[in-house]
Amino acid sequence: MLALVIEGLVMLGELSKAAELYPHAREFIGTGAVVLWPVFRFTQTTAGIAASAAHQWEAAEEHFQIAMHQAEALPDRLEQAEIRRFHVMMLLDRAAPGDRDKAQMLLREALVTYTQIGMPRHIEMVQSLLK
């Protein structure tokens, strides 16, 4: 449920509320859990989303990087695309030098996966971020 709440709050623009849940996301990682059920969202992805909402950029980058390594090792193509999408949202929010270029690359990669899997709503979300 935590993953759904954090992701939902971020998608609704309630970043401060999602940020408050970051300590709980870190607790899940501390238990050794890798995936949250029933949404099959990686704990590191969830922590990255919450850290992004809290503007803890370095922590978010680390969580997304670990999550991507896990998703590639499993492999889980859908989670890879989701990690990229949420990482992009963090990069666009942070807006540091080079972030926009990196975001564009990640979005193109996510778009390929969403297209191959056949996820039209996610394709729309990625295309709106590309603009």
PLM regions: where:
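Helix-coil-helix junctions within alpha-helical repeat/solenoid scaffolds
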Residues: 1-131
